[in-house]
Amino acid sequence: MLNAELDALIKKPIYSISRSALKEYEEEYFAKKCKKSKEQIEEAKTIIPGGVQHNLAFNYPFPIVMVKAKGNRLYDVDGNEYYDFLQAGGPTIIGSNDDVVRDKVIELLEDCGPSTGLFHPYEYKLAKKISECVPSVEMFRMLGSGTEACMCAVRVARLATGHKNVIKMGGAYHGWSDQLAWGMRVPGTLNLQSHGVPLFVFKHTQEFFPNDLKSLERKLI
């Protein structure tokens, strides 16, 4: 049922939003219903670049300040309710602020606080569970972010193979490390969105086009 609905959605034509409609939406919604968000973001900009700590929070005409989350709903500082299609970029797949997860996190915090920097039994339990659910993951190591994971993967691969070149999917986001900031968002854009990264850094980085095996094969030959 769900797959059929998604297929039907994908087959629908792409419509663009007219400038007049967008302007009306800004005035009718953001200007009238998101006043506190705008005020707080303007204040945050005085000390935080862009007013937010993560790019996912950027929004036009200004970021929305969220103060509550539960299940598939988000609530902003002005009291507006939203359906959460972002899911924190992917990790909150069971919804936000799940009761079971929250209670377990609180229990752990009461026992040893937010961090000790040392090993905890749950680290092994998580690694084992992931390996059981995804058999191809024979070994599992957690890192602080996707950027660090990609940096580590590149280094390990180079060490294991003795090769230098890296091939990434064009248009895909592989973190903010210098060597992978190539062809981001749109395939074939090369270093268009790599401001501040010297060109020589990409000497061993290439990209292939998504869903194009021939493009990948040409890079591998």
Each language-model region and where it sits:
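Non-catalytic, mobile gating and regulatory segments of ester bond hydrolases
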Residues: 1-31
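Hydrophobic alpha-helical scaffolding
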Residues: 30, 34, 116, 206-209
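PLP-dependent aspartate aminotransferase-fold enzymes
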Residues: 100, 128-221
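Short, hydrophobic/aliphatic alpha-helical segments
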Residues: 35-44, 73-80, 131-132
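Active-site and channel-lining beta-strand-loop segments
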Residues: 63-84
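Active-site-adjacent loop/helix segments that line or gate small-molecule/cofactor pockets in enzymes
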Residues: 19-68
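Electropositive phosphate-/nucleotide-binding environments in soluble metabolic enzymes
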Residues: 34-38, 68, 95, 99, ...
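Glycine-rich loop-to-alpha-helix module at the N-terminal edge of alpha/beta enzyme cores
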Residues: 2-11, 81-163
